[in-house]
Amino acid sequence: MSGGGVFTDILAAAGRIFEVMVEGHWETVGMLFDSLGKGTMRINRNAYGSMGGGTSLRGS
């Protein structure tokens, strides 16, 4: 859609900027959930480690 005028060019540029912002935003959200999940796994392992066959006082 070349030659569509200044308004079309501005819309195209704004669309590209928005696309980059959304991609960066979702990448950040993904990293946040990833680290949140790892933290939750670590907490569960510390709290319930004996249930998962880790070191436990049972059977000693």
From Swiss-Prot:
A bacteriochlorophyll c binds at H25. One of its GO terms (cellular component) is chlorosome envelope. InterPro entries: Bchl_c-bd (IPR001470), Bchl_C-bd_sf (IPR038387). It comes from the Bacteria. Keywords: Bacteriochlorophyll, Chlorophyll, Chlorosome, Chromophore, Electron transport, Formylation, Magnesium, Metal-binding, Photosynthesis, Transport. Belongs to the BChl C/E-binding protein family. This is Bacteriochlorophyll c-binding protein. It comes from Pelodictyon luteolum. The lineage of its organism: Bacteria, Pseudomonadati, Chlorobiota, Chlorobiia, Chlorobiales.
